[in-house]
């Protein structure tokens, strides 16, 4: 059965719960993560929901605000560590608009060890998406779109669950 699993709220400044991320679980038990919230609390949220980081291979980052982006650094770190230990099969693809690729890469280079950042472009793929572009993610056709926010360049997506 497909599930939409909400891991956090839509509020950036929460203190008693986690913020801004969710996951789609398909009928085969595979995951598509949307944003990662604002820090390492993403790891706790995944643990609470019994979602192994090693089973997440597709992630979409909507924009660069801290409550969406900073948890992504932790995801890259933990996925990279799992790759290094031989406990992560395949690649992790992080979809985001083209302006976020360098932002994400730079933050990782400034905060993570080289053996993790060396995986970016190899096993951790930063995949830029354009307005109107379609990708096959899990068994879903996903269409990305620019939401025209005045706060920051932000993308969303459309898909149809089975």
What are these regions (language model features)?
Residues 1-162:
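Binuclear metal-dependent hydrolase catalytic cores
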């Amino acid at each position: 059965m497909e599930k939409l699993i909400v891991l956090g709220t839509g509020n950036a400044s929460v203190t008693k719960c986690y913020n801004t991320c969710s996951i789609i679980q398909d009928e085969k038990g595979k995951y598509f993560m949307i944003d990662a919230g604002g820090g390492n609390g993403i790891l706790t949220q995944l643990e609470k929901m019994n979602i192994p980081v090693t089973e997440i291979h597709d992630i979409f980052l909507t924009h660069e605000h801290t409550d969406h982006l900073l948890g992504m650094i932790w995801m890259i770190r933990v996925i990279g560590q799992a790759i290094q230990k031989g406990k992560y099969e395949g690649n992790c693809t992080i979809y985001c608009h083209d302006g976020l690729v360098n932002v994400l890469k730079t933050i990782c280079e400034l905060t993570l060890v080289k053996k993790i950042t060396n995986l970016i472009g190899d096993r951790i793929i930063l995949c830029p998406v354009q307005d109107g572009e379609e990708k096959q993610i899990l068994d879903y056709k996903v269409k990305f779109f620019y939401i025209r926010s005045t706060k920051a360049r932000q993308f969303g997506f459309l898909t149809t669950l089975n």
